[in-house]
């Protein structure tokens, strides 16, 4: 009987402990960065049409669509620092969307850090800590 009670108590502690670990892991900067974001501003200017960014923490890949062309590449992230490598892109021309195409490429090349607060991602330049881009995390 004592073994059964002891085993039950140990199992309870184990289950409760595992539950807490999941909460901590879910709030790490890497976990918060993972997912799809809809870009709201580039260099403090509202943008249209819709620009999407997706960060995949499993293989550190970034993917996006700037309104016309898809782009992708690799990123490295450590705490709040973020470095986006060279991006590959499709090369179509779309009236009205090319301004965003060029702007997003320039911004992502200059990112040095990020912050996520209340589901809003802000990318900052590496040198001046100036906000380059804001985006809202999509609900999954």
Question: At which residue positions do the language-model features occur?
Answer:
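Bacterial Sec-dependent N-terminal signal peptides
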Residues: 1-29
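Lipid interaction determinants
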Residues: 18-140
